[in-house]
Amino acid sequence: MKNIWRIEFLSDLFDCIGCDEESLEKAIEEKDKYYGGKISIPKKNGYRHIYKVNKACRLYDIQKNLCHYFLGNIMISDNAFGFKKDCNYFDFLEEHKNFYGNSNYLRLDISDFFGSISKELLGNVLNYYVDISEDKEKEKVVTYLLDIILYEDKLIQGTPIAPVVSNL
């Protein structure tokens, strides 16, 4: 498998995920098994739901391969610090600290950050990196990518693909 940052043929997708179309469709059909370990944790205003993915499922390997051979090769903004190797929590503050000359900052947290990344938004982003001239084939690749990445139209925290996708 080779590292790519743009998909130009349907075969590029299958090369980077390490399986054929039939195996991919079977893995997608078994999504409920992959995401089957849902844990509900009580919090102040309800529950926080976390999925414990089944690493024995084929979809786990497909997501890891997609990250390694495709999504992880896409250049991300210099302003994206989340989940980057060799970056810690305070790295994103450094340029603000140096520019403004003080160490005061406001920390905000996005409620359900991964779940807030919509299927429509992700589809638009992926469309940019799928460079196939024939509309039907391009749509098929983007649909497969969304099927690999999302569960119930949401990006799920705890999957090997969520951190990489959230920085796109």
Regions found by a protein language model. Name each.
Residues 16, 20-21, 69-70, 74-77, ...:
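N-terminal low-complexity, intrinsically disordered segments
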Residues 58-107, 163-167:
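Active-site-proximal segment of RNA-dependent polymerases
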Residues 11, 60-64, 120, 143:
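Non-catalytic, well-ordered alpha-helical scaffold segments
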Residues 27, 98-168:
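Conserved polymerase palm-domain catalytic core
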Residues 1-45:
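Non-catalytic, polymerase-adjacent accessory regions of viral genome-replication enzymes
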Residues 39-63, 147-167:
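Short, conserved non-catalytic motifs in the polymerase core
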Residues 10-13, 47-51, 57-58, 133-137:
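Extracytoplasmic glycan-interaction modules
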